Swiss-Prot record:
Protein name: Kunitz-type serine protease inhibitor homolog beta-bungarotoxin B chain
PANTHER family given in the database record: BPTI_KUNITZ INHIBITOR DOMAIN-CONTAINING PROTEIN (PTHR10083:SF374), KUNITZ-TYPE PROTEASE INHIBITOR-RELATED (PTHR10083)
Record-linked InterPro entries: Kunitz_BPTI, Kunitz_BPTI_sf, Prtase_inh_Kunz-CS, TFPI/VKTCI-like
Coiled coil: none
Family that this chain belongs to: Belongs to the venom Kunitz-type family.
Tissue specificity annotation: Expressed by the venom gland.
Signal peptide: 1-24
Subcellular location: Secreted
Keywords tagged on the record: Disulfide bond, Neurotoxin, Presynaptic neurotoxin, Secreted, Signal, Toxin
An example molecular function term from Gene Ontology annotations: toxin activity
Organism, as annotated: Bungarus flaviceps flaviceps
Amino acid sequence: MSSGSLLLLLGLLTLLAELTPVSSRKRHPDCDKPPNKKRCTGHIPAFYYNPQRKTCERFSYGGCKGNGNHFKTPQLCMCHCHE
């Protein structure tokens, strides 16, 4: 395969990956869990995915263990959880 063909194939595969709908990507396994609002010493602004509203909402993460349904930004939350 020539280098030009290989470059074209690589470009097409990259385009295909970018056009793949988010719904076909694997969701974070904890997205359906409620946010862990246990009060610990931390008051860390975070976002959790609300599956009923299909959006990410802000909450105060205490910093103690918790589950995976807490993200630093709403963009990360939506990227990992939105269907």
